[in-house]
Amino acid sequence: MMYKLGVLLIICLLLFPLTAVPQDGDQPADRPAERMQDDISFEHDRFFDPVKRCCKYGWTCWLGCSPCCG
């Protein structure tokens, strides 16, 4: 019985290593400088109109550009 549990434990550790589980230190809230560098907002979208402060075309809203001009 103990042998089977040991084999099962080894198989589980090989399939799901502990390094695959995200640690607390890997959270974006702990790294504000990197979070600021990775800022991908709608203002950097090629369909965004900076004068109107909205997306140029209505169909671009389906692609994730927001807010829509209407």
UniProtKB/Swiss-Prot annotation:
Notes on the domains: The cysteine framework is III (CC-C-C-CC). Classified in the M-2 branch, since 2 residues stand between the fourth and the fifth cysteine residues.
Keyword Kinase annotated: no
Signal peptide: 1-20
Protein name: Mu-conotoxin-like Am3.4
Post-translational events: Contains 3 disulfide bonds.
Residue ranges annotated as propeptide in the record: 21-53
Family under the similarity heading: Belongs to the conotoxin M superfamily.
A Pfam short name: Conotoxin
Subcellular location: Secreted
Disulfides per UniProt: 54-69, 55-65, 61-68
Tissues and organs where the protein is expressed, per its UniProt entry: Expressed by the venom duct.
Modified residues (Cysteine amide): 69
GO MF term list: ion channel inhibitor activity; sodium channel regulator activity; toxin activity
Key words of the record: Amidation, Cleavage on pair of basic residues, Disulfide bond, Hydroxylation, Ion channel impairing toxin, Neurotoxin, Secreted, Signal, Toxin, Voltage-gated sodium channel impairing toxin
Primary role: Mu-conotoxins block voltage-gated sodium channels (Nav).
GO CC, alphabetical: extracellular region
Modification 4-hydroxyproline occurs at: 67
InterPro entries: Conotoxin (IPR004214)
Protein's UniProt keywords contain Metal-binding: no
